Amino acid sequence: MKKYLLIIIGVTLVLILLWWAGIERTIKLMMRADIRFILLAILMYCISVLIWAVRWNTFLKGANINVSFVKVIEGVFIGIFLNNLTPGARTGGEAVKVIFIKKASSNGSYSKVFATVIADRILDVIPVVVFMMLAFLYALTIHARVLLIILGISAIILVIILLMTTVFSIKEKYALSALLYLARIFRKIFPSKFSMSEDKIKEKLLGEIREFKETFLRLAKRKRRLSSTMLYSFILWGADILKTYFIFLSLGGRITFLQVLLVRMASIAVAMISVIPGGIGITEVVQSALFLAVGVEKALAVSVTMLDRLISFWIPTLLGGILVLKNRKLLVSSS
């Protein structure tokens, strides 16, 4: 019930934003969009998703997990769908991606697949931190104090998350303590699902943690694979920023690539702390406000944001939902 209430609040924020910018003017602007640049924006989004799948597939191959590339792409969209249903940093889809690929593969285990997902997430954070630093330097030149604070704090938080994830991935003691704590909570909530003793749970968790750690370290030691996946990550985020830039060009807007970079990084930072699933409403309001901060007219700012969200949020969420329904038997099957 709370989730639905938050979604209603988010949709209300979108409607208020459209009313503030002028619904008729905003719709007219979007209807006049140059289809050539819109197609380029869609192409950039498709490239970013394809690169994401290639990067994850590289880690899956490195872990010797046999799964078709089509299933990897499906796994990415299923993850997007479920991430867009969860608030904040949107990590709800990662667990389902693990389940999906484990069941879709011929030889994958949960701990091995989870190691590839964590490695993929770590490689996703590094370019964001780099681009945030570039945006921070640009914000310094234009004396945007609010943006400087947002970007600075966000970059620090991301680095801390990155370090904590890495430590928990290689230190058995910390990982076991955290998982045992969660197991005790779940045992109280679902006692029938956790009938085994704590010693048995600990033994099972330790086995999974060791397999995860072994897989994670093996992936980390392969320098050539790491170099290629790092390159994929920068291409992915570069395509994401170009997508928004092309949407601006489609509406005849005048903006620099650095301004788009600044707004995208700052809006990602704010979306991380959104309590509304998928950042609905919050992302639209924040991104539009940030475009205003760099001198974009309000109707244009809102039009760009709406088209951006249509391409990178609503359509992928719909596709992901369709793929969840298509693969529902696989996802709920026991194995």
UniProtKB/Swiss-Prot annotation:
Localisation: Cell membrane
Chief localisation class: membrane
Membrane topology: Multi-pass membrane protein
Keyword Cell membrane: yes
Transmembrane segments: 4-24, 34-54, 62-82, 122-142, 148-168, 231-251, 266-286, 304-324
GO CC terms: plasma membrane
Record-given protein name: UPF0104 membrane protein PH1989
Organism the protein comes from: Pyrococcus horikoshii (strain ATCC 700860 / DSM 12428 / JCM 9974 / NBRC 100139 / OT-3)
